[in-house]
Amino acid sequence: MENLLLNAWSTVGSVVLAILILLVMITIHEFGHYIAGKLLGFRIDEFSIGFGPALFKRRSKKTGELFALRLIPLGGYCAFAGEDGLDDETDTKQEEGEEGDPKKNGEKLSVSEPFPQFQEDGAQPKPSDADRASAANVPSADGALEAHKRDESVAQPSVQTCVGGASEEGNLSEKDKEAPVRTGGEFTKMAPWKRIIVLIAGAFMNYVLAVFLLIVCFFAYGQTMIAVYKAEPTAEIPAQYCLQDYDILLEAQGKKLYLTTDVAQALNGHKAGDLVEMRISRVVGTKEDGTYLREEMDVRIALRADVDVRNSADLDGVWRALGIAYETEGESGVWQLANASYRFGFWETLGRSFAYSFKIAGSIFKVLGELLTGRLGISALGGPLTTISVTSQIAGRSFRGFLEIAGFLGVNLAVFNLLPIPALDGSKVVFTVIEWIRKKPLNRKVEAIIHAVGFVLLLGFAVLVDILQFV
């Protein structure tokens, strides 16, 4: 019973740790948008960590910006003034002389209404700047507004739901309601190049943090490399052309190894009997303290089978060709591989930290390509629940695991948010570039609809891949 309780507490603690990692990554992402916006003169209405009802909120006396900590710790947003762009259309119509008809003047509802771009036409007085600033601090009635906001963060490959509540304007104190008049430009009225910088700033901050964590991890613990736990003995191939127990794989065919897919890429297309060049770290003795004495060496390994890799998950043929032992456990089996920490020199460690981040980013594009071409099924992916599950398992093992998975998630979040998928920062960049080239924006309502539909599809996809993982 005691062990059961300890295991339960350990599991809960690991899950909480995983959620905290995601929350930190999302907060850093939104802070990137925030700091870029401040430096470039944008007016910001709210910076929120989490979604749903506010647990804590405070309005800055100096800037009038609302800072909030909300109940659901699976997202966040940085709300820029005028980012829905409806004011632009209103101003344009007024300049063209469309006055007197409230249906043509394009007055916008308070942002407390869901999807203001779908508002019913009706005569309303145009809100003042102070009213607009106050309204911008009220969360949406059902979270739909936050769903298509530019600054919503999504954890790779998951999409976070936006849980809103009733308007909280009444919950603010009179002191908080008396916000000063803010300075700065509305989002859609700022220069396109400034908007692009703000849009990519979140991903940039995620990447910077991820590389920093990887550098700390690699210098403190070494890089995690693929090691042979047990090699399959054979009398058909001389021992000098075989891998041995506890060999650590460093390079294959002159290419440095970072991920298991790197081994597959280096050996793909080779036939049984081919000799491949590899650099390994091999045990050559034992130190006085009982640890292994290792030596780096270049060896030629004879492949025992053809290597024909179909996708990123198809690695069985690679391990079979290298002579890795395979042991059956019940109805399944396990290749006798292990992870080993390996320390490199100062400059190589620094270079490998950046190279590893590039490899992670490249693997994302590779997997997406395999999905689009049908070479990989969506069952190989995971949604938010899978992300939390895997993160909790790795981060809960050690501080080293915490650093590695945090760095991995940071790169994933950066790359995923820059993909040109509606509702993500990347698609906003695409729309802004098109506007820059055309010298005028696309229809703001159409753009908002595209992002809203994109969000719903992303959410549905995330739920689907999670279901496939747990069914």
PLM features per residue range, with description:
Residues 10-121, 126-131, 137-146, 151-178, ...:
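Small-residue-rich helix-interface/hinge motifs
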